[in-house]
Amino acid sequence: MGRSPCCEKKNGLKKGPWTPEEDQKLIDYINIHGYGNWRTLPKNAGLQRCGKSCRLRWTNYLRPDIKRGRFSFEEEETIIQLHSIMGNKWSAIAARLPGRTDNEIKNYWNTHIRKRLLKMGIDPVTHTPRLDLLDISSILSSSIYNSSHHHHHHHQQHMNMSRLMMSDGNHQPLVNPEILKLATSLFSNQNHPNNTHENNTVNQTEVNQYQTGYNMPGNEELQSWFPIMDQFTNFQDLMPMKTTVQNSLSYDDDCSKSNFVLEPYYSDFASVLTTPSSSPTPLNSSSSTYINSSTCSTEDEKESYYSDNITNYSFDVNGFLQFQ
């Protein structure tokens, strides 16, 4: 036979939106007496409403513990888990979400969660993966945008997505792990060219900084090291007017070639100590100065190159120092 209606279809019962005066009457009565029996409450509270209307008004709008605002991720997880067990029993789901009403949960499910599950390839009715529903392009475009503009926010979304993949011990994972692997693979391939470009830029910057980072001592400092150099007026006769050492070895693309020029003036002695852009010139114990022109080469190439050129580009300073 079923349950009888909460109220008879009587003339004089008001329908439609509630007025502030009616809301206040309902609040005052429940605060004093409690809601008790919803069938008799309207008459006792002096309201021209049916019991169901009073119950819905109180439950969905007037009770003080109603939580307003957006649903948290934990609440979304709970709704999805409970819906997979109970289906569309919104009142039962709302009873397990403090502060949320069944009507609010139902509306949020239809406007947000259901659409999100469809984009993730999850059937919102059976909660099983369906590849024909998966919208990978939407997931990737959203992830790429968040990664380039809001890295921290994207990291939070990634953590939330990972939590959707994990089981809580009582239920199956909400999203098939294979779907996550596919989306992650595509997302990594999408980001790989950018990462490669950034790494190349950083490497080139480091090479440039290393090449220009070695500062050659100034002329005044060199003159203080070799104060007697100014006395040798015929010092230019001891060396060629201009010597160019050019490294012709072939290296990798990220290596550079060094050119060194000894200018025809030697009073400041700076040109004799010209150094390569990426490594300082060693001054050995026998006071012989070697001009080193290899950069970014292996040890074997350096040894071979030095053995061929060390006799050609060295001179003895001891002869000069004896005049002192």
UniProtKB/Swiss-Prot annotation:
GO cellular component: nucleus
Record domain HTH myb-type: where: 10-62, 63-117
Tissue note: Highly expressed in flowers and at lower levels in rosette leaves and cauline leaves. Expressed at low levels in roots, stems and siliques.
SUPFAM superfamilies with a match to the protein in the record: Homeodomain-like
Binding region for DNA: 38-62, 90-113
Protein's cellular compartments: Nucleus
Chief location category: nucleus
UniProt keywords, alphabetically: DNA-binding, Nucleus, Repeat, Stress response, Transcription, Transcription regulation
Top-rank lineage group of the source organism: Eukaryota
Gene Ontology process terms (BP): response to abscisic acid
Induction summary: Induced by salt stress.
MF term (GO), any: transcription cis-regulatory region binding
Function of the molecule: Probable transcription factor that may function in salt stress response.
Family matches, as PANTHER family: F14D16.11-RELATED
Misc: Seeds over-expressing MYB74 display hypersensitivity to salt stress during seed germination.
Protein name: Transcription factor MYB74
Species annotation: Arabidopsis thaliana (Mouse-ear cress)
Taxon lineage: Eukaryota, Viridiplantae, Streptophyta, Embryophyta, Tracheophyta
